[in-house]
């Protein structure tokens, strides 16, 4: 499980600048400029030093690392595909499958317990469980 300082170190190593930027609706976003430089903007409301910040930062890093970007004119299915790529990257880094298997083997089986153990939100943990059990992020089909 990757901790918050390691996520910021990873961003720095990859030359991805993380900026304070007010984003009332989404909390965070990432952009790639024509030259390939990536930037992540995060609203102060999600920069809590904990769960929200880890989930938002890892998701936005997922966009940057996988190159999964879209614009406001993109079709909904295209947006979903890029969001899923970013989420899958984040899941693999915040909730590694081997660590999740260990947690379940130790009796940690409730979503809230798993979320607490891995330092993520319950909705993020739903995505992680869906991804590892069903191979997709369609939580609405399974929960």
Give the positions of each predicted feature.
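Active-site hotspot residues in diverse enzymes, especially metal/ion-binding acidic/histidine motifs
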Residues: 1-143
């Amino acid at each position: 499980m990757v901790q918050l300082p390691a996520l910021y170190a990873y961003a720095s190593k990859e030359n991805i600048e993380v900026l304070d930027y007010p984003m009332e609706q989404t909390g965070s976003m990432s952009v790639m400029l024509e030259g390939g430089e990536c930037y992540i903007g995060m609203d102060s409301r999600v920069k809590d030093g904990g769960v929200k910040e880890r989930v938002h930062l890892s998701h936005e890093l997922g966009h940057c690392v996988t190159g999964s970007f879209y614009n406001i004119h993109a079709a909904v299915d295209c947006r979903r595909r890029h969001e899923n790529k970013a989420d899958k990257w984040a899941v693999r880094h915040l909730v590694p499958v081997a660590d999740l298997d260990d947690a379940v083997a130790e009796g940690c089986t409730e979503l809230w317990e798993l979320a607490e153990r891995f330092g993520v939100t319950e909705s993020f943990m739903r995505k992680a469980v869906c991804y590892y059990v069903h191979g997709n992020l369609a939580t609405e089909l399974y929960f």
